[in-house]
Amino acid sequence: MNKLDKLYKLCEDENIQIEWVNFNPCILGVYISDKDIPPTIALNKSIFNDRLKTMEILAEEVGHHFTTNGNFANRLLHYSDRVRLIKEEQKAARWACNFLIGDDELFDCVKKCTSEDELIEMLDVSFGILYDKLRFCSVENMELLYNICNYLKSV
């Protein structure tokens, strides 16, 4: 089962509905959770035929299902609201990266690949997801980066 199929299966298991809608082009996905309706992820129809972009956006929106507290659909009138929104977006993005690229998978692929493009292809993710995963690793898991760097030095 590929990563996108795993995301769809997770949505099914969590009773998250997925809707394809015509959004403004700058909005690619939205997670909606309200007591009166089941959790729903609305994805922009413009990414329907782009498997990697769909996987990236869907993973982040599923990340909101597991990490976001509160409703951010309201207008952000105060600076503290914007800061809180940024933190929630970071949590969802971190969840997405960890779901799509496990630490062991990243380390194993780094050992086998000779280029960034090869690494992206082997991990079956977009450059953006790989970049974010490495950025989050640099903050959270220095041991993983240390192991990757040591391996690269020994090659």
Q: Predicted regions span which residues?
A:
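Active-site hotspot residues in diverse enzymes, especially metal/ion-binding acidic/histidine motifs
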Residues: 1-155
